[in-house]
Amino acid sequence: MPLDPTTMPYRPNVGVMAINRAGLVWIGRRVGSPNQDALRKSGARIDGWWQMPQGGIDKNEDPRAAALRELTEETGMRTAAIIAESSRWYTYDLPPDLLGKVLGGKYRGQSQKWFLLRFTGHDGEIDINPVDHDQEFDAWRWAPLDDVLAEIVPFKRDVYEQVIAEFRPLVVAG
């Protein structure tokens, strides 16, 4: 019997838009992204699904602390400061083929509080192969804000559009 997503909760989560001194946004290619050949055959002009760091909020954890923790766990970045927090929580639903298979199989999607952080360290600080955390990304790069949406995991694009619109005025070279 198929799962009924309307009976499932959203997972509390934080998302992080990390920008560097040049105002570029950090994005990582998801481990397990579709391979390049499959994407080319589908007509896509990208080499996998990319996204910004994000992750679950631990029990009794403050979302700001969760954002800094997730950034460090997934990217190795430690030299970053919070510039802004989203004005609201954004939600997305998982596509039917992932429902019951990801997020512990018990969530319909995620409810996310987003944070804009400025990375002031050097790129050598970035390490996507963590020792104490599952690897989320197999590649990373800094991208212009206007290029980010085209490469985002499709079911997250609506949230990304809204987050980018909210943070755009603050994404300036520093």
Predicted feature locations:
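Residue-level marker of positions within ordered structural domains that often coincide
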Residues: 21, 120, 165
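Charged phosphate-binding loop/patch that engages nucleotide di/tri-phosphates or the phosphate backbone
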Residues: 145-174
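Generic alpha-helical hydrophobic packing signal
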Residues: 24, 67, 71, 80, ...
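Functional cleft and adjacent loop/helix regions within the main domain
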Residues: 32, 49, 98-104, 145, ...
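N-terminal strand-loop-strand
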Residues: 2-52
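Short, glycine/charged-enriched secondary-structure capping and boundary segments
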Residues: 32-33, 41-43, 97-98, 130, ...
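Unchanged
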Residues: 55-154
